[in-house]
Design a protein with these regions (language model features):
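Glycine-rich flexible loops
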Residues: 1-204
Length: 204
């Protein structure tokens, strides 16, 4: 596994830049909410728990974990977040950083980049009585899934494993925001922009 500061490709730096941009948008991320990840081989770098995406470039807040070890741990349907931490080859930083509780969710989504935001426009619509019907109108031509609310973390990971299809790269989480997946940062940016345009048209 890649350790510490050894992984500093241009792509990784652009990932940090995009994470910071997301963190600056208060309609997408509030305080320490939201998380992003990038995969390189079996290593996934993910935002550490309790840290702010707005600080993605100014401080060390990404933690490397083994994707295969997380997936192996999830085979035990009774596993907990702490048990996953014990089972993975985690490099604990001098500051004691721990990966986001959403790390399992990121690991089971087979895309290079995962961006999870607490988008207020998505959440405002998701709590409405007929929201799923509305989302079907808005995103009819996208590869997306609506995920009924479950507790963030392990429970959400299992729900995604149950409902997702191979091609799904957009997930609407009831009362919990949005997940956008892609193989490039440009794809991530385009999806976010496209989703925003669709939501604005719907509300207007």
């Amino acid at each position: 596994m890649i350790k510490g500061n050894d992984f500093r490709s241009k792509e990784y730096e652009l990932f940090l830049e995009r994470s910071e941009e997301i963190g600056l948008d208060r309609t997408m991320v509030q305080a320490a909410g939201g998380n992003t990840s990038i995969k390189e081989g079996d290593t996934m770098w993910i935002k550490s728990s309790g840290k702010w995406l707005i600080d993605a470039r100014s401080s060390e807040l990404m933690v490397p974990v083994s994707i295969s070890q997380i997936k192996d741990a999830l085979k035990d349907s009774s596993c907990s977040y702490d048990e996953i931490l014990k089972s993975i080859d985690l490099k604990i930083s001098p500051d004691g950083l721990r990966p986001s509780v959403e790390a399992p969710m990121h690991a089971i989504l087979d895309f290079k980049f995962i961006f999870h935001t607490h988008d207020i426009f998505i959440n405002a619509l998701a709590v409405q009585k007929y929201s799923q019907i509305d989302f079907e109108k808005i995103f009819s031509d996208l590869n997306w899934k609506f995920i009924p609310y479950v507790k963030p973390g392990i429970e959400l990971s299992y729900k995604l494993m149950q409902l997702k299809s191979f091609e799904d790269n957009v997930f609407i989480l009831e009362n919990h925001g949005l997940i956008v997946c892609g193989e490039s940062l440009e794809e991530i940016r385009h999806l976010y922009q496209d989703i925003r345009v669709r939501l604005k048209k719907f509300h207007n």
